[in-house]
């Protein structure tokens, strides 16, 4: 019988599993990752894994959210830079983040395997790509309003810009390489500006 964990222990174990999964993903990719190896490294019973996730795909989605959240927390420290040009700031964040993910997807199988999971049509709404960015967009919009630099921000529209950027970079091979980055940037800038009223 699996040990019952306190809420504090659950959070610590979940974080440790995700950190360990990140290490293993980079070493082996998602397909080669075994729950047995992961739980052994974390020091919990294999059955305890299922107290946190229903399967490996659910873990992969959480790890991607976890890693994205870490990166976005760093960007939050730069919110003051966005006051002069909110559209330009968010365009640059989406563009740089997306190009980084695209490059990693080309170089590291773990990312392309993770993108495949995120691209499935049967994902529940809370597991779609853009949802990862909702809290970040809400905080950024609140910051802009607090400082009086915007009138309105369509948070859901901006969440969908993140989703659209994912769809485009995941299908970048369909574009002539010399045009992709320009088209990609224009898409992001134009759609971001649609959802921010100054």
Regions inferred by a protein language model and the residue ranges of each:
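Amphipathic alpha-helical segments used for helix-helix packing
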Residues: 89, 100-123, 171-174
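Basic, helix-initiating cap at the start of DNA-binding domains
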Residues: 1-28, 36-37, 41
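An amphipathic alpha-helix adjacent to DNA-recognition modules
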Residues: 11-19, 31-32, 52-76, 80, ...
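Solvent-exposed, amphipathic alpha-helical segments
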Residues: 16, 20-28, 74-78, 161-172
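Hydrophobic alpha-helical connector segments
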Residues: 62, 76-103, 158-162
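Amphipathic alpha-helical packing segments from all-alpha helical-bundle domains
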Residues: 69-76, 120-147, 156-160, 182
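Helix-turn-helix
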Residues: 24-58, 62
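Hydrophobic/aromatic-rich alpha-helical bundle segments in the mid-to-C-terminal region
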Residues: 145-189
